[in-house]
């Protein structure tokens, strides 16, 4: 099956840095890809490009304000972010930079539910989640 080949290649590309957080992130990409493919057989593999677009896209929040993931996490998810409401510092999202990201798979799902509902007004789709995490896996260097 083409999807398994694509996922296998994706896994090999990232296996050189197989830390627990990266491994969990890869597992989540695989999980969400399978769910997305089950719902839509045309969805074959995560798109890093779509993940980056999603990360930077501004949405009108349920409160009427515009926000994007990058609003708090900066344009580069390898950077330290800052909550736009509280001003609190946010550790980098990129699992290759922040080894604590994606260590708790249940927490990841809770955070997706919370943030997707806060920003989009609905849960993110499995394909959006797969694309998003695939993009985060590519960000390895904070900008200065």
Curated annotation (Swiss-Prot):
Q: How does it assemble?
A: Monomer.
Q: Which key words are in the record? A: Disulfide bond, Electron transport, Heme, Iron, Metal-binding, Signal, Transport
**Disulfide bond residue pairs:** 116-124
One of the record's GO molecular function terms: metal ion binding
Q: Which domain of life is it from?
A: Bacteria
Segments crossing the lipid bilayer: none
| PTM comment, free text | Binds 1 heme c group covalently per subunit. The heme is low-spin in the oxidized state but switches to a high-spin form upon reduction, due to the dissociation of one of the axial histidines, His-115.
Q: Where does heme c bind?
A: 69, 72-73, 115
Task: Show the Gene3D superfamilies listed in the entry.
Answer: Cytochrome c-like domain
Name the InterPro entries for this protein.
Cyt_c-like_dom, Cyt_c-like_dom_sf, DUF1924_SHP
The entry's protein name is Cytochrome c''
Signal peptide start-end: 1-20
């Amino acid at each position: 099956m083409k999807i398994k080949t694509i996922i296998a290649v994706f896994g090999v590309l990232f296996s050189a840095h197989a830390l627990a957080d990266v491994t969990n992130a890869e597992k989540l990409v695989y999980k969400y890809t399978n769910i997305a493919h089950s719902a839509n057989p045309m969805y074959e593999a995560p798109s890093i490009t779509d993940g980056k677009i999603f990360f930077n896209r501004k949405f009108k929040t349920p409160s009427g304000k515009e926000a994007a993931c990058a609003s708090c996490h900066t344009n580069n998810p390898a950077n330290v972010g800052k909550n736009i409401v509280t001003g609190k510092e946010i550790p980098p999202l990129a699992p290759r930079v922040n080894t604590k990201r994606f260590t708790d798979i249940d927490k990841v799902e809770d955070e997706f539910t919370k943030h997707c509902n806060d920003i989009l007004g609905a849960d993110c789709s499995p394909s959006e989640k797969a694309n998003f995490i695939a993009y985060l896996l590519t960000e390895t260097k904070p900008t200065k």
